[in-house]
């Protein structure tokens, strides 16, 4: 009898875990095949995305750096080109990223939940449009490959962190 009770409890627990809602999703990888892998997965622990720096030249997205909470990620990519920077308003989040690519990422356009449209780079190449799979989720971190430019980019979505008091 005890064995049956334990079996029922185990099945009920497994069933409850299987119906929990998922919140994370992944978009990408968009771009070429070169470069060295990078990931900001650990940076998301510093808080939500609060600012983005993008270095561009006439042809490509050369480099990028993202601020998570109040901490900037390591810069990835090359050093040539113009550095552009945008800051998100408190509580504002990126909910869509579109762009263009060929062998390198050529354009990135960030769209926020406050209706802002933040474009970087050149409008040429193969188009992509990345949005989260699950409702009420936002861009949490970026990964990809880089060398002298941003070769490829991936976007990672999840719920807005509830633990950031300074963001």
Swiss-Prot record:
Coiled coil: none annotated. Pfam families: Jacalin. Keywords: Cytoplasmic vesicle, Extracellular matrix, Golgi apparatus, Lectin, Protein transport, Secreted, Signal, Transport. Belongs to the jacalin lectin family. One of its GO terms (cellular component) is extracellular space. May play a role in protein trafficking. May act as a linker molecule between the submembranous matrix on the luminal side of zymogen granule membrane (ZGM) and aggregated secretory proteins during granule formation in the TGN. One of its GO terms (molecular function) is peptidoglycan binding. InterPro entries: Jacalin-like_lectin_dom (IPR001229), Jacalin-like_lectin_dom_sf (IPR036404), PolyBind_ProtTraffic (IPR052321). It comes from Rattus norvegicus (Rat). PROSITE patterns: JACALIN_LECTIN. The keyword Signal applies. It is found in: Secreted, Extracellular space, Extracellular matrix; Zymogen granule lumen; Golgi apparatus lumen. Residues 1-16 form the signal peptide. This is Zymogen granule membrane protein 16. Expressed in pancreas, colon, duodenum, and much less in stomach. Gene3D superfamilies: Jacalin-like lectin domain. SMART domains: Jacalin.
């Amino acid at each position: 009898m005890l064995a049956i009770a334990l079996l029922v409890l185990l099945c009920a627990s497994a069933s409850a875990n299987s119906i929990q809602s998922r919140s994370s999703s992944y978009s990408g990888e968009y771009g070429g095949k070169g470069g060295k892998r990078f990931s900001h997965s650990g940076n998301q622990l510093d808080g939500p995305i609060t600012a983005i720096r993008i270095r561009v030249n006439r042809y490509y997205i050369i480099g990028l750096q993202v601020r998570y909470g109040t901490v900037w990620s390591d810069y990835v990519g090359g050093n040539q080109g113009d550095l552009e920077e945008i800051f998100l308003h408190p509580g504002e989040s990126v909910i869509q990223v579109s762009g263009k690519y060929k062998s390198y990422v050529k354009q990135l356009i960030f769209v926020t939940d406050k209706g802002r449209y933040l474009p970087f780079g050149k409008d040429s190449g193969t188009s992509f449009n990345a949005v989260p799979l699950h409702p009420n989720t936002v861009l949490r971190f970026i990964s990809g490959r880089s060398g002298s430019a941003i070769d490829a980019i991936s976007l990672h979505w999840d719920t807005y962190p509830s633990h950031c008091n300074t963001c």
